[in-house]
C-alpha cells in the first residue's frame, strides 16, 4: 500500500513538472483571459489611469535617484558575488540558479534507473577523489629541532602549521604505540607524550621515560638472584623516547644521529624479542608490528642523517638494505629518499633502475617519480637543445620523448616548474604533502632543484616546453590526458598545510565569470551616467539627443566624436571664448 502511494505521488510530481515545462504558454493565456474578464470588478482601468498620472508627475530627479539606488544595490550584489567567488570559487547566483531554481523549473531529469546504473561509476570516482585528496607523510621531511626550529630562531616565522603538526602527532601515535603500552611504564609515558601539544612537555616526558628505566635497573638488580641479573641488564631502554629527543631536542644533525644510534640499539633489541613472540597472540603481534615500524623509522632517519652530513654512499647503502629487509613497508616511501641520494651521486643508471621498478601504472605516482623520469629523458637531449633549431627542423625522437615526459610530469603536478625555474620563492617543506598540490611541489623542488641545475640545459628545456601541457588539457578539472582530472580539493588542503606567509599556488587559475564582469561594467556605467545627469542635466539631455540623432541619421558611417560635440555646441549655443583685453599701464 505504501509503495503504491509513493508511486502515485512520484507520478503526480512528474505530471506537474511536465505540465510546467511544456504548458506554460497555455497557463499564461489563461491568466490573461482571467484578467480581461475581471477587469471591471478589479477596476483595472482606474488603476492604470492612476498609475499613469503618478508617472507623469514624477520629476527627473526621481529617475536620477532611482538609477543611483539601483546602482548602489547592484554594486552591493557585485561585492558580495566577488567575495563569494574568492572564498568558494564559484558564482553564488549561478550556484543558486543551478541547484535550486533548475529543479523547480523541471531541469532535472527523473531517471532513477540511470542513477542506479551509474552508482558503481560514481562510487569509483568518489573513491578516486578521496585518494587524490589524501594527505601523505613527506618522505623527505626535515628534523624539527635541527632544521625547523633553527629557521624559527633566525626568521621568527613558524614553518609548520598546527594542522601539519597535528597530523604528525597522529602518525606517531599510529606507528609508535600499541594496546599493550600501559603494561610498561616508559611506553605508557611516551603514549601520553605523543599526544602532548607543547614541545617542552614532550621533551620532558621523553627524559622521564628514560629515567624510569634507569631507576628500575638500579633498584631491582640488588634484590634479585644472580641468575636473573643478565636478563635485567638486557632490558632495553625506550627507543621511542630517543626518537622524540632526536627529532625535537637535538639542535644539529650530528646530535640527532647520536640519539638515533642509541634508539637503534634499543629498538633492535625490542624487535628481535617481539619477533620471537609474535605468534603467541594478537597482543604480541600488535607489539611486533609497532616494533617493526619503530625500527624502520630509526634506520630511515639514520640514512637521512648520513645524507645530510655528506656521507651519501653510506646513506644509499642503508636505504637499499632497508628496502631489502622490509620490502612490504611502502608507507615510508623510502625509494624517494633513495632516488634523491642517487641523483646526488649522479648515478643515473641506478636511478633508471629504481624508476623501472616504481614508475608502474599500478603504483601511486608522485612528483618525485614523474619529474625524475622527465629529468632523465631531458638529460639525453638538453645539452644540444635549441628552440630555434627545433622550430626549423622539428623535434627528434629523443627530444619528443623528453617533451612528452615533461608534459606528463607537469600534468601530474603543475606547480613544480615555477619553483624549478625560480619564478616563485621556496620555503621549508611541510611534514605532510598533498599529491599534485603546491605542498608536494615545494617538497620536491626543495631537494631536487640542485639536481636539475646540475644537468646542463635541463631547465632551459623545461622553460621552453612546460606551458605546452595546458593546451593538451584545456579543462583539467573535468578531463585529464594521462592522469585523472585535477582534484579540486588541493587548494584548501594546501592552505592548511602551508604557513600563512606563503602564497599558495592555485591551479587552474580562477577567472572571474562573465556575469561578474558584465555586472561590474554595467553598474559602473550606470552610476557614471546617473552622476553626470544629476550634475549636468541640460548637457546630458542634449548629449543624449545628439547621440540618438546620429545613430538614426544617414550619416552613421561617418560620425565621430567631433560631430557629437559640434551638435552639442549648436544646441546649447555656447558663445565663443572672450578675447583677452590689454589695459594700458
Swiss-Prot record:
InterPro entries: ST7. It is a multi-pass membrane protein. The keyword Transcription does not apply. It comes from the Eukaryota. Keywords: Glycoprotein, Membrane, Phosphoprotein, Transmembrane, Transmembrane helix. Glycans are attached at residue 47. CDD domains: ST7. The modification Phosphoserine is found at residue 386. The chain crosses the membrane at residues 15-35, 62-82, 512-532. GO terms for cellular component: membrane. PANTHER family: SUPPRESSION OF TUMORIGENICITY 7, SUPPRESSOR OF TUMORIGENICITY 7 PROTEIN. This is Suppressor of tumorigenicity 7 protein. The lineage of its organism: Eukaryota, Metazoa, Chordata, Craniata, Vertebrata.
Amino acid at each position: 500500500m505504501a509503495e503504491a502511494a509513493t508511486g502515485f505521488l512520484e507520478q503526480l510530481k512528474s505530471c506537474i513538472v511536465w505540465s510546467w515545462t511544456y504548458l506554460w504558454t497555455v497557463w499564461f493565456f489563461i491568466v490573461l483571459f482571467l484578467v480581461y474578464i475581471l477587469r471591471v470588478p478589479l477596476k483595472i482601468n482606474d488603476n492604470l489611469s492612476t498609475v499613469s498620472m503618478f508617472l507623469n508627475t514624477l520629476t527627473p530627479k526621481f529617475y536620477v535617484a532611482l538609477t543611483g539606488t539601483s546602482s548602489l544595490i547592484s554594486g552591493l550584489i557585485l561585492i558580495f558575488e566577488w567575495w563569494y567567488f574568492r572564498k568558494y570559487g564559484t558564482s553564488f547566483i549561478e550556484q543558486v540558479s543551478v541547484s535550486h531554481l533548475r529543479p523547480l523549473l523541471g531541469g532535472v531529469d527523473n531517471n532513477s534507473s540511470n542513477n542506479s546504473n551509474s552508482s558503481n561509476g560514481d562510487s569509483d570516482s568518489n573513491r578516486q577523489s578521496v585518494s587524490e585528496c589524501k594527505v601523505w607523510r613527506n618522505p623527505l621531511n626535515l628534523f624539527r629541532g635541527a632544521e625547523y626550529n633553527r629557521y624559527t630562531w633566525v626568521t621568527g616565522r613558524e614553518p609548520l602549521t598546527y594542522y601539519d603538526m597535528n597530523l604528525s602527532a597522529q602518525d606517531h601515535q599510529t606507528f609508535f604505540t600499541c594496546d599493550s603500552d600501559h603494561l610498561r611504564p616508559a611506553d605508557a609515558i611516551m603514549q601520553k607524550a605523543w599526544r602532548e601539544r607543547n614541545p617542552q612537555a614532550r621533551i620532558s616526558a621523553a627524559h622521564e621515560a628514560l629515567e624510569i628505566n634507569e631507576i628500575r635497573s638500579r633498584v631491582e638488580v640488588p634484590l634479585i638472584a644472580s641468575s636473573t641479573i643478565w636478563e635485567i641488564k638486557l632490558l632495553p631502554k625506550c627507543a621511542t623516547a630517543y626518537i622524540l629527543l632526536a627529532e625535537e631536542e637535538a639542535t644539529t644533525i650530528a646530535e640527532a644521529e647520536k640519539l638515533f644510534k642509541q634508539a637503534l640499539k634499543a629498538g633492535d633489541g625490542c624487535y628481535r624479542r617481539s619477533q620471537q613472540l609474535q605468534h603467541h597472540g594478537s597482543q604480541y603481534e600488535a607489539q611486533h608490528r609497532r616494533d617493526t615500524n619503530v625500527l624502520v623509522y630509526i634506520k630511515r632517519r639514520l640514512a637521512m642523517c648520513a645524507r645530510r652530513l655528506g656521507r651519501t654512499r653510506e646513506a644509499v647503502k642503508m636505504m637499499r638494505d632497508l628496502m631489502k629487509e622490509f620490502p612490504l613497508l611502502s608507507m615510508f616511501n623510502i625509494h624517494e629518499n633513495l632516488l634523491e641520494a642517487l641523483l646526488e651521486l649522479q648515478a643515473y643508471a641506478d636511478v633508471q633502475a629504481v624508476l623501472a621498478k616504481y614508475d608502474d601504472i599500478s603504483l601511486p605516482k608522485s612528483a618525485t617519480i614523474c619529474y625524475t623520469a622527465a629529468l632523465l629523458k631531458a638529460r639525453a637531449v638538453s645539452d644540444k637543445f635549441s628552440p630555434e633549431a627545433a622550430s626549423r627542423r622539428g623535434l627528434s625522437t629523443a627530444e619528443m620523448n623528453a617533451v612528452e615526459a615533461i608534459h606528463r610530469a607537469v600534468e601530474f603536478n603543475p606547480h613544480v616548474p615555477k619553483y624549478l625555474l625560480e619564478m616563485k620563492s621556496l620555503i621549508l617543506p611541510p611534514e605532510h604533502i598533498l599529491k599534485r598540490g603546491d605542498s608536494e611541489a615545494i617538497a620536491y623542488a626543495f631537494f631536487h632543484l640542485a639536481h636539475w641545475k646540475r644537468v646542463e640545459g635541463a631547465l632551459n628545456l623545461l622553460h621552453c616546453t612546460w606551458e605546452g601541457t595546458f593546451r593538451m588539457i584545456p579543462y583539467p578539472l573535468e578531463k585529464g590526458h594521462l592522469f585523472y582530472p585535477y582534484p579540486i580539493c588541493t587548494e584548501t588542503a594546501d592552505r592548511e598545510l602551508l604557513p600563512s606567509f606563503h602564497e599558495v599556488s592555485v591551479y587552474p587559475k580562477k577567472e572571474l565569470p562573465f556575469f561578474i564582469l558584465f555586472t561590474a561594467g554595467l553598474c559602473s556605467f550606470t552610476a557614471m551616467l546617473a552622476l553626470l545627469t544629476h550634475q549636468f542635466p541640460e548637457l546630458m539631455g542634449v548629449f543624449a539627443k545628439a547621440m540618438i540623432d546620429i545613430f538614426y541619421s544617414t550619416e552613421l558611417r561617418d560620425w565621430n566624436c567631433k560631430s557629437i560635440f559640434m551638435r552639442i555646441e549648436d544646441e546649447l549655443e555656447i558663445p565663443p571664448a572672450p578675447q583677452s583685453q590689454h589695459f594700458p599701464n
